[in-house]
Amino acid sequence: MKYFVVALTLAVAFVCIEECKTVEIGYAVSEDFDQNEIDNEEARQAFKTFTPDWNKIRNDAKRMQDNLEQMKKRFNLNLEEARQAFQTFKPDWNKIRYDAMKMQTSLGQMKKRFNL
C-alpha cells in the first residue's frame, strides 16, 4: 500500500509538471506567432520582387530530362540482359544437393568438436 501511495504521488506530480510545461510552451508559441506574422509579411514582399531565371530553370529541367532518358535506356538494356541470363541459367541441382549435404555434415562435426 505504501508503494501505491508513493507511485500515485509521483504520477500526480509528473502530470502537474507536464501541464505547466504545456502552458509555458503555449505562451511561447503565441509570442512567436505574433513575430511570424511580421516575418510572413516580409516574405510576401520579398516574393513579389523575386524574378526567377526561367532560362536557367528550363536548361536545368532539360538536362535532368536527358539524364533520365539515358538512365532509362541503360537500365532497360541491363534488364534485358538479366532476363536472357536468367532464362539460360540451368542450375546443377545434384551438385547443389551434394554441397548442401556436405556442409550439413561439416556443421554436425563442428558442433560435436566444440560441444555446441
Swiss-Prot record:
InterPro entries: Latarcin_precursor (IPR018802). It is found in: Secreted. One of its GO terms (cellular component) is extracellular region. Residues 1-22 form the signal peptide. Residues 23-44, 80-83 form a propeptide. One of its GO terms (molecular function) is toxin activity. Keywords: Pyrrolidone carboxylic acid, Secreted, Signal, Toxin. A motif (Processing quadruplet motif 1) lies at residues 41-44. Cleavage of the propeptide depends on the processing quadruplet motif (XXXR, with at least one of X being E). The keyword S-adenosyl-L-methionine does not apply. Expressed by the venom gland. A motif (Processing quadruplet motif 2) lies at residues 80-83. The modification Pyrrolidone carboxylic acid is found at Q84. Disulfide bonds: none annotated. Pfam families: Latarcin (PF10279). Belongs to the cationic peptide 03 (latarcin) family. 06 subfamily. The mature peptides (45-79 and 84-116) probably form alpha-helices which disrupt target cell membranes. This is M-zodatoxin-Lt6a/b. It comes from Lachesana tarabaevi (Spider).
